[in-house]
From Swiss-Prot:
Keywords: Apicoplast, DNA-directed RNA polymerase, Nucleotidyltransferase, Plastid, Transcription, Transferase. The lineage of its organism: Eukaryota, Sar, Alveolata, Apicomplexa, Conoidasida. InterPro entries: DNA-dir_RNA_pol_bsu_ext_1_sf, DNA-dir_RNA_pol_su2, DNA-dir_RNAP_su2_dom, DNA-dir_RNAP_su2_hyb_sf, RNA_pol_Rpb2_2_sf, RNA_pol_Rpb2_3, RNA_pol_Rpb2_7, RNA_pol_RPB2_OB-fold. In plastids the minimal PEP RNA polymerase catalytic core is composed of four subunits: alpha, beta, beta', and beta''. When a (nuclear-encoded) sigma factor is associated with the core the holoenzyme is formed, which can initiate transcription (Potential). This is DNA-directed RNA polymerase subunit beta. The keyword Nucleotidyltransferase applies. Belongs to the RNA polymerase beta chain family. It comes from Neospora caninum (Coccidian parasite).
Amino acid sequence: MAFKIKTFLSIKSHKIFYTDFYFFLKKKLIILIKNIFPEYFNFNNKYKNWNLICLPDFLYFKVNNTHFLDNVQYINSLIKIFLPLKFQNLKTNQIFFKNLLIFELPKYNSHNYCYLNGLKKIFISKYFTSNGIFFHKYLKRKYDIYYAKILLTNSNFFNIVLDLKLKQIYLSIKNLKFNFILFLYYLGINNKDILKYSRYKKSKILKLLIFTALQTNLINNKKFILKNLNYLKSIFKVTNLNKNYKHFIINKNKLNYNYGNFNKNNFLTIDFIFILDLLLDLQSKKLCFKNIDHLDNKHINTIGNYFQHNFKFYLKKFISIIPNLIKLKKFSLLKVYNFKELLILNPLIQYLEQINSFSELTHKYKLNNYNSSLKGILNLREICLNQIGKLCLIDTTEGINCGLIVNFAKHIRIYKKGIIQIYVSPVFKNKTKEFINFKTSLDQELYLIQFNNINLRKNKLFNENIKVVYNKNNFRIKFISNKKSFLLKFADLFSFTENLIPFIKYNDPARCLMGAKMQSQSVPLLNKKKSFVVTGYEKEIITKSDITIKALQEGIVLNASSLKIHIKDLFNREIVYYLSKYKKSNQNTLIHQKPLVWNGERVFTNQLLTQHQDIIDSEFAIGNNLLIYYGNFCGYDFEDAVIGSKRVLYQQLFSSLHMDIYEFNFGYNNENDIEFSTLEIPKQSYYIKKSLDSLGIVKEGEKILTGNILLTKIKVTKPNYTYKSIFKLIYSIFGKTIRNIKDNSLYIQTGKNGRVSKIELFLINTNSHYKTYNNSYLKCRIFICKQRFLTVGDKLCGRYGNKGILSYIAENADLPFLQNSFYPDIIVGALGIPSRMNLGQLFEALVGKIGFSYNIRILPSFTSSSNAYFNYLKILIYNFLMFNNLKKGFNWLYNFNLPGKFLIRDGRTGIKLKSSVLCGVSRYSKLIHMIKDKLHFRTTGPYTEILQQPLKGKKNLGGQRFGEMEIWALEAFGASYNLKEILNYKSDDCFARNNLKDYLLFRNSELQNSTITESFRVILKEFNGLILNLELFLITDDLEENYLNLTINY
């Protein structure tokens, strides 16, 4: 199948997983119930005799109506599965039908997520080893042992082991081990059949194996087989093999390519003999091994397969307890299995990352690359050559799951049975065709796969015909003048995350991985700009993302507002698209959509109708272009610390919006005991109630501070008097009945300041089946939008893994400046570039400076570098700088001695500095790890018993924890007392603590200096355990007999 490149926008489509889920419900679930459920259930008791018949062919589903479902409340609709049952009374011959509710599952929508507990959750795909034959080799007693592992569909497997030292071949199933030749006799295969169908009928090795089976092990193995005959029949009986044999030797075309001819019409006779021949081929080194982790031997598990696997367990459990669940008089179900709990506990079903539209896209295309058994997990972490074009070579998770959780490549297609296909362009006579072809791993190894931009020599004629190609799972250098080959582009080796890095070739791959992760962790900004240096894939990301609204049909826009868009399509149908306004993501960032079309505009299929908060002109833009100096300033740029200017703060270049939601209910016990909201609350002044409306709810658009009231809630109850005479006396004095008033108003906590953006009120239907709160009649939800400015302690990052903590915000007048009076936006230390091999950020700074000077955007093209070879980028940058110098008329813009560097002056004195610095324009963004979320305080709290350190985390009332980059920022700022407390006294000094307590309480001892902390004492014990001794000696002056001062900080 061929497609034009212009119209091809294929990736792991959501429709595959969406249709697979519903195909399981419509087809596979019926087959599963038929296989597991017995056809008849007989219930006999003293009074009635009943016969129960299951009717899985009439299985039907029911989804919640929109009357009960409110999309605003993020309540996911449930799919109810009903099993029709037929009841028959054997005495009276009475027959009636009953629909039995057996399961409830959350609805899985076409965007590859479902709602659980009000939050979006996504299913991560998983690789599973396909059923079939796998060959292995291991060393035992200095001899090679060859064996074939055969995996069946029911997860059973057995091994056929060839041991030439013992001169035998045997079959092993779990703990059973017996001769393979005798096993063939058991299947009805005699010596004549073995010699007839085997290719080694004249070989001495095969005759030796038959002879040893007959002479040495005949009696013992025959008794052993007869003893375990029932177990063998349960595995190899014909009824089981008829079901399993379709996948027993899976995909015989694959095995024909790898190992030879498998007869498709035969059952087991020739196939087992052929496996014997393959083991002998491997022993004689006529064939090479195929790794079990090869992508040919794996398939992708979808959510339909996940439910199918778990339904087997629940259906079997359901059968065992179905007599107790059904009451014969009422015929009602007492217990329903809800799969919501199963989806919450599964580690592959995770909360969707919604920091920005890019993070949501990358999270959906993750892949679990290992099975439940973690054997050989070190080999799985490595990059296999067969993953080229299918899995990203760089993108993976960090930590213990490194190499196990990977991402799909940019352009792939999921084919039948979960097989990955890549697209390649055919090349003939060094000309790339317009059409593309899809190739699997098998097809990929049959043809020659070229990679562009790989030049072996400087001679052009040599590079035209001799190329580096990928063939038969290896890289080769071949002459391909007239041979048919295919081209795999450089961008198709990576996922979307890496393709957003412009100069990825000039960076360390580990830093590229870090830069890709940080782009998905960047916060959408209020004042964002498109970068001067682009890669060309910014618009393609938006077409793949589901966070924007795309047109389903071609039509004319009737009405476009901030709430909804009306479109009339070609069939005169009216389609309404509702926009998300001021919604909260899973990471508390703001989701806000704006319309891109106007009234009367003609829209086409898959055209963008809205834009997100991180989209500008249908292009992903999440940062700002900043003028950067690579140098130092008063030591504030220590290690990776960043110095910012006040201009960045005043112009709000890194200001972001975040959302908090407060949700509460109004309940009741009876008519006289009810909660309500009112403006007349006791013991509160007018100043506190000025932001409330007449109902006692905060007004929309109000600015709220710490201690303000969001909503008033009062509960009035009648007092209980034991004596009615006292109640009458109080009524006669005051003239009113006395009531107990309890104030349950909601106040703003510290650090939660913001502005009320939206208020939602919901009436709770007390008669509804989907009632979520007991004794509640009203639910109120208040959205508070917070604007966070750039502060000291926030983390800034670029696109190349370069990140740092903002350590100081300086005045513009104090910063060094260029000869045209340009002040830098941020100053970054230059020592981190060569040590981390981050040359890409230097190229981006220089090319961005050119784009800033000419007011243009630059797309670096690496495909045209074949003419200039390795000097292409250097020539490009030098020419741009020189032309910029000639156009502006300033000689200082291009220094012939130091190209790309500029002389600067000190902003405080105006004196020209001795050294020159590299100055450029690069894109920076703000990460979600902000200082307001990190800082928390405590006066007292729990400590660990051994190290005497504060516990970790806010949940445990732990102490403040500082990371490596936070320490660098403190060192740059010169916070010596904080550093001493963090580094030296992070663990308490028990002796000094007790001395301080005695001094403050009893005054019976003098206050002494601090000694060694408890954690340092633990380190000393660890050294002693390693037979190392650490001692401290004082140096003395022998002439004056005085101790010399020795200051040591532990």
